[in-house]
Structures are given as C-alpha cells and as structure tokens.
C-alpha cells in the first residue's frame, strides 16, 4: 500500500479552499446573460467552447491532491444540481464557494464548525421553503419559452422551439435533441405511437413515391410469437377480407410460407395486408405489444393467456385511423382504444418509473408513457461548425431540462432575485446559540452571491445593484442583459423554482461537509527518479591493451 500524506486543521482546510476557488472561479464566469465563454482543450480535434457550468467543472483536475479534493467536492455540487434539475449548476457552484469561504473564516476565528453547519442547514431549509411557496405555476407557452430562453443563455430561438415542441407533444411527450444537418434549428413532431420496426417485405409498399406502407383504418393483429405457418392465419385473413378493410400484423416475426402467402395475397389485391416485427426484446417486447393493444383496443394473441391464432376473431383485432410503415419505423395514428384504459396504463407505467432504480429502465418506461399519452418531438440543432454545434446542443439540452423543471414545480423571478427575497424572508431566523446564528448569517450572505456574480459578469458594480434590489420588493430586480431595473416576471426573466431550490440544497450540503473537515488523507506523490546508470566497474584493466 502506498504511503499516505495527512494534513490536519487549518493546513487541510486552506489547501481545500484553494481547490474550491480555482474551480468556482472558472465556472462562475459563465453566469448570467453576459457570462463569458470558457474554452476547453481536447486531446483530439478542436477545443470545445462552452457557457455550461457543469461542462467546465467536469474538465478541472488539479495536480496537488489536497487542492484537487476541494475542487472535486465543488464539482459534486454542480453534478448534483445537473442530475436533479438539469440546470442551475453555475448558481450552485457560486453558492457553495460563498458558503465555504465565509464558513472557513469563521472556523479560523474559533467558532464551532458543527454549530456553523447546523446554522447553515437551518437557513437553507427555511430559504427552500420560501422559494417553494413563492413559485408561480408555469403552464402557458409564453412562460415556457421564457424559461428556455434564459437557460439557453438568452437565445430566444431555443426557448421558442422548446415551447412549440412542448405544446405539440404535451408535458408527458418525449422531446429529444439531435444534431441537424442545416444551419437553422428544426422541429420534427411524430404524432401517435412510433416504434423502430419497419415492413418485413418491400412488396407491402403502397406509396411508391416515399417507399412506405400506408393503410387507412386497418385492423391490427398483435401476436407475441413467430408466424411461419399460413394455416394459423387463414381464419383471420378470411374475416378481414369479408370486412373489406386492410390488415396490419405486428408479430415477433413472420417468415417462410406465411410471409410468402401474405405477399401474394397483397399483390393480387385479395386482401390488403402488411406485416412488421414487434418492437423491443424479451419482456419489454411483451409490455410494448400490450401498450399497442391498449392503444388500438385490441388483444395480444398469446399462448400465455390461452389464445391461439387459429381461434382469433375480429373482436381480438385492434383498430386505428392510420398505420404507416417505412423501412425502419412504423407509426400508429389515432388508435381506437378507450381513453380510460390508456390513462390507466399510463398511470401503471408511471408507478413502475417511481419504483425502478435503473436510469436506463426509467428512460425506456418514460418513452412508453410518451408514446401512449402524447407523441415524440425531435429538435434538430443547426450550426455552421462542429464546435458551435456541440456548444449549441448542450445549451438546448440544458434549456429543455430547465423547462421541464419549470412545468413541474413552477417559476420564480430570475437573475438571483428569488434568493435575495429569501434572504429578507429569513431575516429574523436565529440559531440555538451564537455560532449557529453565525451559520445562518453565512448562508444569508451567500444567497446574495449569484446576483452579485451576474452583475459583475455584466461589468456593473455589484454592491450598488445588490443594494437597490434589496430595497425593492416582490419581483423587482435587475435585468443584466439590458441594464434595466423592473419586474423580472414581466421582463420574462424566470428561473424554475426546482433549479433554484436544488442549487441551494446541493451547495449547503457540500459546503457544510467542507467546513466541518478536520483532516485530509491523500497518496504521497512518488519520487520519480530516473533509471540508475550502471557503474563502469570491472573495465579498469584496459590500460594493458596498448
């Protein structure tokens, strides 16, 4: 085991503080509408330019092990804010830096670190309650666009496209962000349920122009096994032919003579038919077939529930207004399932999302909810260069997280104003002793830091602006983008309450741990001496060779 280096007390805390400040100083330059860019070097390819706090934080590693520990703990603050709310990483970092700096001064002055931490926790909890209670619901397109705009560093195009996407697919819909091919941002919306399986044979194609299968108001047969024997399918085919409607088969697979017979029937016009594989694999495939059954008002033909294909009737088939298939995807529009059944299924899947511990499973379940409840929107990000594309895509993702958070818990005035109002709201808060009250004061002072940093980045005098905002009330604040004072909500400067709350909680938690640190242990740096040069001994007798 390698030897360890141990530092105690003030020595340890000062080293840690250096790391905290290096990381926070790099991150906080990006805060606000006039935040600056940070350029990150990459081992391969062009450097990345970003105004995203967590991207900057993730890049920073310090050579000194003890300083690096401080930096990594603040990085944890940014990551926590990013994971929980998807935004607010820079605000969280600024808050943590302010609490740690003030807190360590108080520890050096002889105050009890544990009492300071209790005071900080008390103030943070009270401020969080204030933020929650002052939040206003965010439901209309305009406020969603404003939240997206602020989070995307005042890019109104991004805010507008996110608001449009949310309007089209609803709050439950899935919105994904992809790299586009043009210069402009584009929005693609798929209504209905889309899944990534295409037609099994090109002979099913009905629209030669775009090489797709399109059937209006078809019957939909759902089977959770392979179909290779045509005899099993005959009763259903005959019933559908009599009804004079098209048939779409969604099964684990259709192969051999069954597929050949379907193709021949289709080409001769005896019955319009098309087939595709069921989406997903294993248990997820069964669940998705069940989703399609509920959406279309049909029944999955499965031997597990005692149903076989030969006994299937028209009652077992689902229906939809339209079913389209391309080579890779299929879309069911306007399934005939009852709204109550679909709602019950959505609630059941939501319960599974709450219970699952796997992020991957939660994401897949959320996709299923979207397919049943809303739709899927894809935002294609356009840019002139690869570097700009990456930077813009990161901002769109940030803005998307922020708007989701706003819809979830409401909005508060932005620009650091809600935290300034929280300071006033907890002005009378006292601890159980002097040191705890000092902890409360530290947290209150720190809550002014985001506003001061936004103003500093805009090139104004922080103390003057902070004093003026403190003197106002309600939503009165300073718009650093235009240099105007006024009502932040009316000026469209909003922050999601969840983002502000998460930033404060993450900062208070990690900063409290740092203030109460008394010892630090790290590996001793190894002395990397060069390889020893072998001595030239044993060659001394060469003189006699002359």
UniProtKB/Swiss-Prot annotation:
A GO term from the CC aspect: cytoplasm
Stretches of the chain forming a coiled coil according to its record: none
One BP term from GO: protein refolding
EC number in record: 5.6.1.7
Record's keyword annotation contains Isomerase: yes
Signal sequence bounds: none
GO MF entries: ATP binding; ATP-dependent protein folding chaperone; isomerase activity; unfolded protein binding
UniProt xrefs under Gene3D superfamilies: GroEL (3.50.7.10), GroEL-like equatorial domain (1.10.560.10), TCP-1-like chaperonin intermediate domain (3.30.260.10)
Subcellular location(s) of the protein: Cytoplasm
Keyword field: ATP-binding, Chaperone, Cytoplasm, Isomerase, Nucleotide-binding
Listed InterPro entries: Chaperonin_Cpn60_CS, Cpn60/GroEL, Cpn60/GroEL/TCP-1, GroEL-like_apical_dom_sf, GROEL-like_equatorial_sf, TCP-1-like_intermed_sf
Enzyme class: isomerase
Assembly description: Forms a cylinder of 14 subunits composed of two heptameric rings stacked back-to-back. Interacts with the co-chaperonin GroES.
Entry's family note: Belongs to the chaperonin (HSP60) family.
HAMAP family given in the database record: CH60 (MF_00600)
Protein's name according to its UniProt entry: Chaperonin GroEL
Gene name tied to this protein: groEL
């Amino acid at each position: 085991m390698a030897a360890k280096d141990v530092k105690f007390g003030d020595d340890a805390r000062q080293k840690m503080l250096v790391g905290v400040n290096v990381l926070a100083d790099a991150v906080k330059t990006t805060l606000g509408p006039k935040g600056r860019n940070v350029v990150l070097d990459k081992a391969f390819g062009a450097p990345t330019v970003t105004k995203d706090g967590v991207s900057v934080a993730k890049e920073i590693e310090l050579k000194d092990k003890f300083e690096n520990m401080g930096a990594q703990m603040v990085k944890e603050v940014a990551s926590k804010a990013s994971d929980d709310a998807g935004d607010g990483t820079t605000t969280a970092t600024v808050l943590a830096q302010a609490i740690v700096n003030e807190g360590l001064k108080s520890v050096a002055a002889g105050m009890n670190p544990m009492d300071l931490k209790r005071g900080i926790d008390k103030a943070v909890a009270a401020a969080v309650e204030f933020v929650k209670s002052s939040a206003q619901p965010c439901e209309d397109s305009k406020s969603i666009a404003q939240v997206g705009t602020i989070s995307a560093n005042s890019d109104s195009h991004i805010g507008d496209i996110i608001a449009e996407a949310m309007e089209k697919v609803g709050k439950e819909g899935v919105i994904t962000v992809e790299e586009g091919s043009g210069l402009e941002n584009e929005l693609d919306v798929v209504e209905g349920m889309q899944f990534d399986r295409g037609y099994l044979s090109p002979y099913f194609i009905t629209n030669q122009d775009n090489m797709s299968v399109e059937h209006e108001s078809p019957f939909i047969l759902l089977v959770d096994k392979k179909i290779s024997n045509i005899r099993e399918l005959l009763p259903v085919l005959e019933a559908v032919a009599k009804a004079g409607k098209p048939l779409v088969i969604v099964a684990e697979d259709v192969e051999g003579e069954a597929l050949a017979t379907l193709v021949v029937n289709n080409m001769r016009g005896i019955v319009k038919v098309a087939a595709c594989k069921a989406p997903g694999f294993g248990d997820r495939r069964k669940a998705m077939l069940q989703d399609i059954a509920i959406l279309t008002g049909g029944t999955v033909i499965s031997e597990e529930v005692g149903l076989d294909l030969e006994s299937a009737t028209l009652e077992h088939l689902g229906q939809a207004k339209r079913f389209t298939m391309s080579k890779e995807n299929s879309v069911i529009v306007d399934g005939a399932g009852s709204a109550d059944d679909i709602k019950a299924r959505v609630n059941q899947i939501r319960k599974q999302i709450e219970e699952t511990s796997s992020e991957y499973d939660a994401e897949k379940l959320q996709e299923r909810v979207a397919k049943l409840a809303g739709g899927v929107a894809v935002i294609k990000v356009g840019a002139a260069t690869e570097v700009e594309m990456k930077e813009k895509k990161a901002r769109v993702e940030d803005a998307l997280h922020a708007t989701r958070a706003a819809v979830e818990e409401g909005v508060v005035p932005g620009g650091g104003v809600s935290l300034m109002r929280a300071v006033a709201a907890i002005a009378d808060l006292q601890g159980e002793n002097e040191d705890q009250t000092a902890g409360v004061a530290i947290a209150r002072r720190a809550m002014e830091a985001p506003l001061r940093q936004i103003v500093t980045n805009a090139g104004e005098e922080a103390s003057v602006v902070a004093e003026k905002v403190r003197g106002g009330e309600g939503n009165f604040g300073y718009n650093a983008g235009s240099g105007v004072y006024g009502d932040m909500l009316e000026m469209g400067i909003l922050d999601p309450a969840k983002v502000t709350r998460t930033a404060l909680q993450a900062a208070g938690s990690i900063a409290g741990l740092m203030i109460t640190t008394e010892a630090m242990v790290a590996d001793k740096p190894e002395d990397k001496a060069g390889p020893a040069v072998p001595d030239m001994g044993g060659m001394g007798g060469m003189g006699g060779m002359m």
